[in-house]
Amino acid sequence: LLSIVAASMTLAACNAQSGYKVTGTIEGMPDGKAFIANFDGTKLDTLAKSDITNGAFEFTGKVSEPTGAFIMVVGQRFSLPIMLENANITVNAGQAGLNVTGSEGQKIYDQFMALNMSIQQEQQKLMPEFQAANQAGDQAKMQEIQDQFQKVVEAAQAKEAELIKANPDSYVSTFVIVSGMGQMEYEQLKEKYSLLGEKAKATAHGKAIAAQIAKLESTAIGQIAPNFTVTTPEGESISLYDIKGK
């Protein structure tokens, strides 16, 4: 009996280390080529390739460490974020949204994405008001809307920081930071990096964040607030920063 149990445990361990299999469908996607790519903050590294037939795809491979990655389609401006681990992962994308299962890290990532969604929803809600104020030439109202949106962003950023604190050594936390660090100023990025544990800092994404901090350090400036840009009836683009500069 002990030998059977030992053999079963050995088999389970081997299966856990065997690699990943990512299967799924993208609704409405024409036949073509797809690939999984890792993003280190500056460039994409292709990890696996697959044909897409009737919207279906299958990737297989192995990662040395769990990582955030993107499913991308050749010739399409299209990407699906997934938390890639050596496991069986299912991906379904369509009008109803993106659903990824099989990856433990995905559960954490979905919490981060819920925060992003709250910002996007608020922006969509405020944009018509901002456009109306712009057309009316009401700069005070435009500033009021911008301030309201900024509060939403700051609240979401505070919740994001709490999530990173709750998952300091998760590769998901480093992936979230890497994905957005191109829009971060020095102090903001440094603060997020400080929330990571040593294990996370030692990952490829953790090292990429450290490299970006070093790059920004010599030209550090204050954090830039989110901006609204709209088109005037005359066809000119105008943003909040244009207004502030007048």
Question: What is each residue range found by the language model?
Answer:
Residues 1-2:
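Bacterial N-terminal signal peptides that target proteins for export
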Residues 245-246:
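Loop/turn elements at helix/coil->beta-strand transitions in domains of secreted/extracellular proteins
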Residues 207-242:
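N-terminal "domain-start" segment that seeds a small globular fold
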Residues 14, 77-79, 99, 106, ...:
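N-terminal targeting signals for export/organelle localization
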Residues 14-158:
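A non-transmembrane, solvent-exposed segment enriched in polar/low-complexity residues
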